[in-house]
């Protein structure tokens, strides 16, 4: 029988073994059950910044609660602007405020900033080199709501935009450190945001965020995992599991995607005999992996092998995050299995 063009292919239809999904399952935190977290780190950090800098204002496209800007709204109601579901207006308003000497912090979902408002960010903010900070929740595969909400290609879109700095923090402490750092940077910034109860990961490594700098969190002789955002948390977990299997894995955290810390990346990749793996919460097209690969190709540095772990060049399914992360290979278990397979080649 000929299938209707509106009928989903069989391989995309859920089977009886799949759990029934609830709304709470689809917006669950990325933190593990026993993992320490900190609530709304961006909202608290921006509120603290505003206490010291009266230029700071916050703008939302009807998503203050879901980008943690509600904390700022409660602390500074006279400096909060609700623009409604109008992302183009959101960006143009921020541009106008920046021209008047304010420092606007714009929040929405990453899909809406990259897909709906790209032209306005490009021409009204980036071309004019205005001091606007665009902070966007739900980067990559951090929601189960499907392609309409999963910003799997945002870095690919924004990497080519001149003047724009791109940040992908790993945890709550790094978000708190990144806010004053990018406030001190004059010019447009795009920051991917982990929201809600955000894991605490980096404090035990004595880590301090520096704009434009990559940091080696863990050394390893067998393989080097280069990562950003939540994938640094996964990379550290994977490195510990690999250690139990006799595999020594290093982790290089790259929170600034643009400008890329090429010197540190090349220095680490130059060490002989190591498999280099780039792990990212983003499509393998146009993100950190391809940025690192291009850096290596422009240099004389050649690692023993180079591989990517990331999301496929496809529109992703809806569902519970643990299920989706396993399905698309970015869970800790899948990362460990993939690296072991590559090392056995």
UniProtKB/Swiss-Prot annotation:
Cofactor: thiamine diphosphate
SUPFAM superfamilies: Thiamin diphosphate-binding fold (THDP-binding), TK C-terminal domain-like
Cofactor binding, note field: Binds 1 thiamine pyrophosphate per subunit.
Phylogenetic placement of the source organism: Bacteria, Pseudomonadati, Pseudomonadota, Alphaproteobacteria, Hyphomicrobiales
Protein name: Putative uncharacterized transketolase family protein y4mN
UniProt xrefs under InterPro entries: PDH/Transketolase, THDP-binding, Transketo_C/PFOR_II, Transketolase-like_Pyr-bd, Transketolase_C
Organism: Sinorhizobium fredii (strain NBRC 101917 / NGR234)
SMART domains assigned: Transket_pyr
Similarity field: Belongs to the transketolase family.
Keyword field: Plasmid, Thiamine pyrophosphate
């Amino acid at each position: 029988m000929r299938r209707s063009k509106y009928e989903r292919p069989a391989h995309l239809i859920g089977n009886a073994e799949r759990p029934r999904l609830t709304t709470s399952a689809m917006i669950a935190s990325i933190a593990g059950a026993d993992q320490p977290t900190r609530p709304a780190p961006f909202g608290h950090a921006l509120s603290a910044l505003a206490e010291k800098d009266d230029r700071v204002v916050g703008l939302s496209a009807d998503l203050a609660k879901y980008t943690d800007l509600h904390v700022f709204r409660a602390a500074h109601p006279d400096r909060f602007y609700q623009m409604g579901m109008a992302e183009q207006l959101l960006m143009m308003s921020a541009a106008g405020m920046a021209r008047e000497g304010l420092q606007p912090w714009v929040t929405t979902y990453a899909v809406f900033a990259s897909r709906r408002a790209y032209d306005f960010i490009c021409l009204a903010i980036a071309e004019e080199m205005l001091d606007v900070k665009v902070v966007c929740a739900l980067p990559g595969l951090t929601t189960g709501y499907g392609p309409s909400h999963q910003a799997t290609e945002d870095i690919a879109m924004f990497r080519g935009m001149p003047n724009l700095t791109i940040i992908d923090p790993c945890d709550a402490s790094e978000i708190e450190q990144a806010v004053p750092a990018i406030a001190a940077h004059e010019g447009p910034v795009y920051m991917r945001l982990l929201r809600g109860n955000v894991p605490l990961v980096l404090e035990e490594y004595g880590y301090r965020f520096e704009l434009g700098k990559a940091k080696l969190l863990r050394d390893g002789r067998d393989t080097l995992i280069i990562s950003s955002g939540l994938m640094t948390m996964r990379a550290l977990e994977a490195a510990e599991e690999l250690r139990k299997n006799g595999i020594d894995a290093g982790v290089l955290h790259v929170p600034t995607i643009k400008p890329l810390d090429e010197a540190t990346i090349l220095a680490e990749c130059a060490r002989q005999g190591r498999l280099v793996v780039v792990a990212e919460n983003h499509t393998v097209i146009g993100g950190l992996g391809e940025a690192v690969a291009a850096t290596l190709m422009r240099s004389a540095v050649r690692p023993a092998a180079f591989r990517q772990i990331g999301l496929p060049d496809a529109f992703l399914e809806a569902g519970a995050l643990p299920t989706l992360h396993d399905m698309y290979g970015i869970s800790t278990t899948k990362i460990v299995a993939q690296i072991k397979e590559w090392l056995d080649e």
